From Swiss-Prot:
GO terms for cellular component: cytoplasm. It comes from Thermus thermophilus (strain ATCC BAA-163 / DSM 7039 / HB27). It comes from the Bacteria. This is Acetylglutamate kinase. The lineage of its organism: Bacteria, Thermotogati, Deinococcota, Deinococci, Thermales. GO terms for molecular function: acetylglutamate kinase activity; ATP binding. The keyword Calcium does not apply.
């Protein structure tokens, strides 16, 4: 059996057919954490709300939280349907279900938080019954739901499961020269990442992607990788032929 993986997928459903094909065909166990950025932004805009971000995190006032949750749940249900139609039985959940994601608020951002505890029992029960869980990044504190960055939520869940984390993005990995495929870094350590940041090799939009992978390692994942979400990517990552793998 192929290795069990935690896979973080984006929230855009445009062009998702190939990605759904890839996930449905993977022979090993999967837990998926999904975002919902495009859907959230679209719904907020329709209702007259402005999207604001601080440090890459969506500011979520209490009056916007229900909209955020609705958009995430719609995204999860559509992804679950797509996988199920392809023969991989999937269920869309959030951290509210069985209280599986407990969070701590970042009050300067409204109802935004970070995951402090993961209850993996529900996920393990579903996996044992042959289901693939899809988890929306909503956590709970004493006051109610919190909007959590999907990348950091994915890292926390991977660590709690003790599974590798694969972050599927729009980039193929870390390259010394993005125009030269021969310069891909197949493996990196946190120390090497810091050196590449200092050299300006890892910069701009690549920084949060790499930080998400490193946060998964800190949470307890045995390894993490970033790779482009395309057909055949998961097996290629396992073979070391695609993406960049991060290890301690």
């Amino acid at each position: 059996m192929s290795e069990a993986l935690l896979v973080k997928v984006g929230g855009s459903l445009r062009g998702a057919e190939a990605l759904l094909d890839e996930l449905a065909a993977y022979p090993g166990p999967l837990v998926l954490v999904h975002g919902g950025g495009p859907e959230i932004g679209a719904w907020l805009g329709r209702l007259g709300y402005e999207s604001r971000f601080v440090g890459g995190l969506r500011v979520t006032p209490p009056e916007q939280l229900e909209v955020v949750e609705m958009a995430l749940y719609l995204t999860g249900k559509r992804l679950a349907e797509g996988l199920s139609r392809r023969g991989r039985k999937a269920l869309a959940l959030s951290g509210r279900d069985a209280l599986c994601l407990k969070g701590r608020a970042l009050p300067e951002l409204g109802r935004v938080g970070e995951v402090v505890e993961v209850e993996v029992g529900l996920l393990q029960d579903l996996l044992a019954k042959g289901y693939t869980p899809l988890l929306a990044p909503i956590a709970l504190d004493a006051e109610g739901p919190l909007n959590v960055n999907a990348d950091t939520a994915a890292g926390a869940v991977a660590g709690a499961l003790g599974w590798p984390a694969v972050f599927l993005t729009d980039v193929e990995g870390v390259y010394r020269d993005p125009k030269d495929p021969r310069t891909r870094f197949p493996r990196l350590t946190p120390k090497e990442v810091e050196a590449l940041k200092g050299e300006g090799v890892i910069q701009g939009g690549m920084i949060p992607k790499v930080e998400a992978a490193l946060s998964a390692l800190r949470a307890g994942a045995p390894w993490a990788a970033i790779a482009k979400g395309e057909r055949g990517v998961l097996e290629a990552v396992l073979r070391g032929e695609a993406g960049t793998r991060f290890t301690l």
